[in-house]
Amino acid sequence: MSSEKQEGSPRRVLSLSDLVNREDSKDASGNTAGAALKPLSNDEVRRRLAHEDYSSNTASQVDDETDTDDGLGEVAFDRADFRFDFEGQERSGGRASGEAEAESGGPGHEKATQQPSDAIATSPDRESTEPRAMDIFEERASLESKKNNLRKDLRVLNEIASTARPGRYKVAPIWAQKWKPTVRALQNVNSKDLMKIDVSFTQVIPDDDLTKSVQDWVYATLLSIPPEQRQYVEVEMKFGILMDRSSDSQRVTPPVSSQTVYMEADARMKPDVDERVFVELNRYVKGISELTENTGKFNIIESHNKDEMYRAGINTQRPRFLRMSKDVKTGRVGEFIEKRRISQLLLFSPKDSYDVKISINVELPVPENDPPEKYMGQAPLNSRTKERISYIHNDSCTRIDITKVTNHNKGKRDDAEVTHEIELELNSQALLAAFDKIAQDSKDYATIVRTFLNNGTIIRRKLTSLSYEIFEGGKKVV
């Protein structure tokens, strides 16, 4: 009877609280959950099943109402992230049909009641791990909350920016830095590369204004000389002091601070230097000529001559001045010429002790029908005895004459005057060769004149330094 009674009575279904109590009792006592559970009455089972059926129907009705368009909510179908959870719908539908079969007592109900307790206990965990589709209204609410949070953050940042003081920069920003030129000439140039610097961006060294003026003056003067007389041209440079014509003892003082061309109408040159400076300069030039690197570059010539000046010509004609040069030791006539002055250029040097006179003359040979013997019995206008040392430097086309001159006025030794003259003479043949081809190439002509002026600058500055050393006590000359 008891077995039949048990078979006729329905099996008890475990509720969620039973499962939880089962797990707790299992952990506490260590016994199985089936032994601790108490059977429920039939009325209690029917009441719980009716309650679960009502809750499932209510959920389906809510879902049906959500799918309609009659409610107050709006469904944003145009959203790109909108999706419908078909798998979840199928699972919920299958769950509802299974509960209906269990209530009607069909085969599905028996199968559900025959499942082991372990599988029933693990079913809530499986459902909790399955992804749940987010409702579109919840998603919209989350987006709105994110936007509101962003607005709040921006509002707070704006308030901080408006009230906070600007911080100090470790490195000043570009708008607060001082302007620096992007192009800096000769910056970061290695000292070893200085030897490779170009003379100019055109690879040409331009002549200064004074050099250009002298070049033009020499060219114009040579052009004015008849071609047949150019071969007798003499270009020489002398050093002395420019004297004012109104006073023979005062040097001119124009308002200039550098070497410049001075008008010859306002001054005259006195070609003379101090004797001690004269001796020291001779020693200086001789020392340069004896240097090892200058071996063979200098030719040294010593001479002792006497020059006599004669005036020739009829009173109705232009007078001619003839110069007769004799060797003092032998008395032999070495040169008999007619010297004509063509032009001269005075250069005033306010920073130096001596000034410069550049003169261009023509030394024409006297015709054979007018021999020197013709003037032997005449008294010369003046005579000059010259003790000269000449240093000829062919590489620069320059001859340096260091001459001690004794002037005899009207041939009387009693009125002798001793002067010390420094003179540079330009090689006439080299100058004329460059002058003849100046139309094809003017570089040679400009180079010759420039080199001549450079040699004159070296001598002039050396004379000045020697003068300072002698007269200011820097050097004692015996």
From Swiss-Prot:
GO CC field: mRNA capping enzyme complex
Basic and acidic residues bias: start-end ranges: 1-10, 41-54, 76-93
Superkingdom field: Eukaryota
GO molecular function: mRNA 5'-triphosphate monophosphatase activity; polynucleotide 5'-phosphatase activity
Cofactor dependency: Mg(2+)
Keywords: Hydrolase, mRNA capping, mRNA processing, Nucleus
Amino acid composition bias (Acidic residues), ranges on this chain: 62-72
EC class: hydrolase
Major subcellular site: nucleus
UniProt record similarity statement: Belongs to the fungal TPase family.
Cited function: First step of mRNA capping. Converts the 5'-triphosphate end of a nascent mRNA chain into a diphosphate end.
Protein name in the entry: mRNA-capping enzyme subunit beta
Provenance organism: Eremothecium gossypii (strain ATCC 10895 / CBS 109.51 / FGSC 9923 / NRRL Y-1056) (Yeast)
